[in-house]
């Protein structure tokens, strides 16, 4: 029978697994001599040979069998077509031949489309990408979902293929579609720990706040599955990548995709993306990405930027429009700056009590803000170094600055104690000075007491006169 014809060449099985061990795609042997059909085969045997040729990836024999009359849309066991099988093993040459012979790219079996099969295929991303591109070029719909409401982009995200994800979106795939459990493509990527896919989806406009049916966001899903780097990145308030490619046209996105380097040429951390520092995140959050190179050329840090004055902004080439955005962001931080240079000089003794009290109140409020800021940093700072997502300088630099900060806080404490002692001394001397002029509050209180005593005395004297007069009249 047919099995006797196949000897000598090992072939691998493929396709989706099923409950039955016999899925219609047997592992067998294909004799090279049988690759050329010397005589017509019975229909049943021809179909078996066709399956074996597909399994072996023998494009020439597949074409010969198609020429002999086998339908390109033949239905094998479980309803799979030749194109569906070729897509499941990422055989680009077979996919191209079958499509050129009229195979339907939009075919589905029980809502399992050929495009979904290609996106969840076994093989390298490069091969999968080529197969998906071929299917999309033949009008395969990227938004048709399977029975679990999973779309091709979800399968690509789940299996860790960022370039396939980008290609699907470029051809109209909805990036924020949810499956029967409320999972989006971003949720699947976060669940499986695919950092490159997470970043690509954020570029393409994925909504990181969409929740699953049990109320979990992608960041929470990542945390639950112990992907802490992804959890930390998704938990950032400002997202420097969000929607970066969303506004590009289909042609622009494809062009950008094709000019992207392969994964082998990318850095280990977060694919080809540069790790973002605090300055970059701040600028991206305000839509001021164009200022990044300018500030880096001038070695301006975020701390320096946030303490700049009007003349410094202008001097460093920052336009008025950009200045307004930065100043508005500073205002939202609700950090009140004390302008010590505008206070009267203490040495001139011209400062009023109200001004001095206002100065002390502002100083106290500012210290409160600083304490709160440091407490927030302590609470948010990752405990372990491997959890840090953003690009950091050497820890020694941070330690050195903290040591200087501690020294300045100690100096401030010492100076405030001196100020307190001086104020107490002045107060004691004033109270003991005979020439001391009472405050208005003190004078007012004394006058009030005198008036009360005078009024009581007059009333008492008047009452005494009334009693005396009444006594004389009776006598």
From Swiss-Prot:
Any single Pfam family the record assigns to this protein: Ank_4
Biological process, per Gene Ontology: cell differentiation; male meiotic nuclear division; regulatory ncRNA-mediated gene silencing; spermatogenesis; transposable element silencing
Ranges for domain SAM: 272-334
The protein's name in its UniProt record: Ankyrin repeat, SAM and basic leucine zipper domain-containing protein 1
UniProt gene name: ASZ1
Keyword Membrane: no
Organism the protein comes from: Equus caballus
Assembly: Interacts with DDX4, PIWIL1, RANBP9 and TDRD1.
In-chain residues carrying the UniProt-annotated modification Phosphoserine: 17-18, 20
GO CC, one annotated term: chromatoid body
């Amino acid at each position: 029978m047919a099995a006797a014809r196949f000897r000598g060449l090992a072939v691998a099985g493929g396709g989706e697994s099923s409950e039955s061990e016999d899925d219609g795609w047997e592992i067998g042997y294909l004799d090279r001599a049988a690759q050329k059909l010397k005589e017509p085969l019975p229909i049943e045997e021809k179909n078996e040979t066709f399956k074996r040729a597909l399994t072996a990836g023998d494009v020439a024999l597949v074409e010969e069998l198609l020429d002999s009359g086998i339908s390109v849309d033949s239905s094998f066991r479980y309803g799979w077509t030749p194109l569906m099988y070729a897509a499941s093993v990422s055989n680009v040459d077979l996919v191209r031949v079958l499509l050129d012979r009229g195979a339907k790219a939009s075919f589905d079996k029980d809502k399992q489309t050929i495009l979904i099969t290609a996106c969840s295929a076994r093989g390298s991303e490069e091969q999968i990408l080529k197969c998906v591109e071929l299917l999309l070029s033949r009008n395969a719909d990227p938004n048709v979902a399977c029975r679990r409401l999973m779309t091709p982009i979800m399968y690509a995200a789940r299996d860790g293929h960022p370039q396939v994800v980008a290609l699907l979106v470029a051809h109209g795939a909805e990036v924020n579609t949810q499956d029967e459990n409320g999972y989006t493509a971003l949720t699947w990527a976060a669940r499986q720990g695919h950092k490159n896919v997470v970043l690509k989806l954020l570029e393409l406009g994925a909504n990181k706040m969409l929740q699953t049916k049990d109320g979990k966001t992608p960041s929470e899903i990542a945390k639950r599955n112990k992907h802490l780097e992804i959890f930390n990145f998704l938990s950032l308030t400002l997202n420097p990548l969000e929607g970066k490619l969303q506004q590009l046209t289909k042609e622009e996105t494809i062009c950008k995709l094709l000019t992207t380097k392969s994964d082998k040429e990318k850095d280990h951390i977060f694919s080809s993306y540069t790790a973002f520092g605090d300055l970059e995140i701040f600028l991206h959050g305000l839509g001021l990405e164009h200022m990044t190179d300018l500030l880096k050329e001038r070695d301006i840090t975020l701390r320096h930027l946030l303490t700049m004055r009007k003349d410094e902004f202008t001097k460093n080439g920052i336009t008025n429009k950009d200045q307004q955005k930065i100043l508005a962001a500073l205002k939202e931080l609700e950090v009140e700056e004390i302008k010590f240079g505008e206070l009267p000089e203490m040495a001139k003794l011209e400062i009023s009590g109200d001004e001095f009290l206002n100065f002390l109140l502002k100083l106290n409020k500012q210290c409160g803000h600083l304490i709160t800021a440091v407490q927030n940093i302590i609470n948010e700072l990752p405990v372990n170094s491997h959890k840090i997502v953003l690009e950091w300088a050497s820890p020694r630099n941070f330690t050195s600055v903290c040591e200087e900060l501690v020294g300045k806080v100690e100096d401030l404490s010492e100076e405030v104690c001196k100020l307190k002692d001086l104020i107490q001394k002045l107060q004691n001397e004033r109270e003991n000075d005979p020439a001391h002029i009472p405050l208005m509050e003190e004078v007012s209180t004394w006058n009030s007491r005198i008036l009360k005593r005078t009024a009581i005395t007059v009333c008492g004297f008047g009452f005494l006169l009334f009693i005396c007069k009444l006594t004389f009249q009776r006598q």
